[in-house]
Each structure stands twice: as C-alpha cells, then as structure tokens.
C-alpha cells in the first residue's frame, strides 16, 4: 500500500517522456512475461509511466520507488484506480532489493517538471529559491549552498567540469568563491544563476540553453550522488530480472547515457534490444521540450542466465 495518504490536490503534473516508444517495446515481448508478475518503477515520480504499464498489462503488480515525498503523494493519487496492484516504497532505488524476480525494471533519470518548477526545491535557475537541490530534504544531507561553501575553488571547478561538462568551470568557480567571500552566501538560486551567466560573453548568454544549466546540473548531481546511485542500479538491476525480463533506462545527459551504454555492453546477463537508443520524435519534442535530450536504452535478461547478484 502507499506510504503516503492520497491527495487529489497534489500539485505534481508530469508528462512521461518516450512513453509510447516504451510501451511499444514492452508490448512486443512475450505475453507470458506480463502475467502474474511484478515490475519495478525505480523512479516513480508522478506515476506517468507506471499508469500506462498498469493499464496495458492487467497481470502485473507494480512496485514504485521514490525518495521524494511530494512525488509519492502525487503518484498515489494518479494510481488510485490500481491500488490493489501497487506498492509505493519511500526509498532511493540504490537501497532497494526486490523480494522476487521481476519482469521489468524502469528508471527515468530526469528531474521531473514539478521539481524544476517549484522554486522552494532549489533546482531551478529560472525561479528564485533556496540553494537546496536535495531530492529528499527530509533525510537531511548537505545542500548545494553548504557544498559550494565547503569546497575550495579547485575542488569546485573540478566538480563543475566533471558533472556539468562545463568548459568555463574554473572561471565560474572563481566567481562563486569570490562572491561568497564578499557576501557570505548567495541569496538564492537566481543570484547564483546570475553570477554564472556573468562568466559568459554577452552573446553566449542569449542562446537557447541558459548559461547556468551545466553548473546547476553539476551541483544537483553532486548533492544527490546521482551517478553513484546510477552505477549501483546498473550493477544490481540485472540480478532482479527474470529470464527475458526488461531493463529500460531513460537518461537526459551524456554522463548518464555513457554509463548505461557501457553497462549494457559489458553486462553478460543482458542483451540489448537495439544498438542505438530511442529518442523523442519531433512531435514529442514540440509537445514536451524536456524530451529533447532524452535517450531510452532497453536490454533484456538473457534466458540462459540464473538470477544472481552482480
């Protein structure tokens, strides 16, 4: 049962990315795979993908994992018609172990629209809010504000370069540390975004991609250990699957996609469904701009491998 009370007023709307493509691939698998079985949505979010899966496959029971309380509440509301087949677990997928082999593990690695659009979460450079960026503030942990204050200029530059692939990382880190020395702290996300944008030439500040995008990505990844968590999922998820079970991962930047691609190539228990990733159609990109960078990679558990750990 859900860990969170149902609420029809949860302000958490999320358009699932590459949903039609995912459902098409799942529908092409042997029908027996979806009979009297469990599936895992490792990044439940608002429950958009999960709702489609439950509608299409009445023989599945779904376990939804999410560490974000607002996401769990929204998913419980959206999935209310299926609650006899749904369990929502308040956990990061890196800390989960299913009690039985499953037919599907799905992970959508993107930050959801509600997280980006709620200023108080601190993820957005377009809306002013506290420099937080924690996926699960209730659990504690270091905020983005605390992290940039703790790191020296070289460590901060290395972080922005490694996790944001930001070519101006050293200039940005010097600006951040100079501002902190002069002001003590940034007033919020808007002040940090303004400082980062100021490190770019004027012409570069007017492009389609905001100049602060890569820096904010880097800080969010570091605050939540997103790549470490993904690595642990890629190590453990193949062992969760039944023979023929599907592992589907949607990534949104090259750091994630490279890890997924490499794992699918090197993991002996998996075989790729396609060599190249699925990407959003022009129509989906027009309807949902956040799908532009999405890549869906899908692999199957080889039928001749016994369930085991990494």
UniProtKB/Swiss-Prot annotation:
Compositionally biased intervals (Basic and acidic residues): 301-310
GO cellular component: cytoplasm
Subcellular compartments: Cytoplasm
Gene3D superfamilies: Putative methyltransferase TM0872, insert domain, Vaccinia Virus protein VP39
Catalytic activity, EC: 2.1.1.199
InterPro entries: RsmH, SAM-dep_MeTrfase_MraW_recog, SAM-dependent_MTases_sf
GO molecular function, one term: rRNA (cytosine-N4-)-methyltransferase activity
GO biological processes: rRNA base methylation
Signal peptide start-end: none
Protein's recorded name: Ribosomal RNA small subunit methyltransferase H
Species name: Synechococcus sp. (strain CC9311)
Gene: rsmH
